[in-house]
């Protein structure tokens, strides 16, 4: 047979994208986000979007250690403070206004959590990097004032990560789930009975039904409703008031949306992703009291900048602990 007569594999539209959308996700309702705010013309590893009670935005830059403050509505960006700990990955706000900063440390055993006042002063350890071996990435508060955090350690064949609960008095740490390949994002359902966890290096979404104590898994209550596809994997997540879950896909320049049972119902794309831009989408968050979702991403690989993008979501965001 002449070589010109052989069957030919050819790219379909979109399949030569740097980050092609898997076939099983191509029929999902899809929107492309709009630019909302440029944080830097440099590629910074933005993370940890969180709003204070005044409606202003805080976020962190992991590798440089800067905690940014964005005054709204004028969107003025300032440096609030520099983390004295290595690789801060998330900022959460207590209802009394204190800032809780999770840091990854050396990515092996020196992560922890410290708290500061609203101006970034008076640092105090909550989870010390001296007496523990966590690599702490994301937290979420419950209504009692305790919080869950993800342990970002391990990789696909070394299951060292997990999720832990810190009591409201910050005196005890209880394991909830363990043996994960880089636990990353964590979110609570509106009734606080379901815990969502993303497992980056295994490309899995965990749905955990909790008993009243908040740490015991209900009988048959731990499941994996979704397996993600592609490199790298699921990152931080948040919920809306309809209990939909929004999961940033790191390395893919998009956010996937799931209903409260874990079925995919939509997706949000970063502009330029097919050409390899803004693939480091890390964290979604809602502007308080609205259905406007913002997502941070950066373009380090292409010597590009660091941006926050925005869309209208399915429902208004859920009011988290700092607004209680």
Curated annotation (Swiss-Prot):
Principal place of residence: cytoplasm
Sequence positions that bind Ca(2+) 1: 47, 137, 184, 235-236
Cofactor requirements of the protein: Ca(2+)
Assigned GO CC terms: cytoplasm
Function: Exhibits lactonase activity. Acts in cells with perturbed membrane integrity and is possibly related to the membrane homeostasis.
Recorded family membership: Belongs to the SMP-30/CGR1 family.
Protein name as annotated: Lactonase drp35
Species: Staphylococcus saprophyticus subsp. saprophyticus (strain ATCC 15305 / DSM 20229 / NCIMB 8711 / NCTC 7292 / S-41)
Gene name of the record: drp35
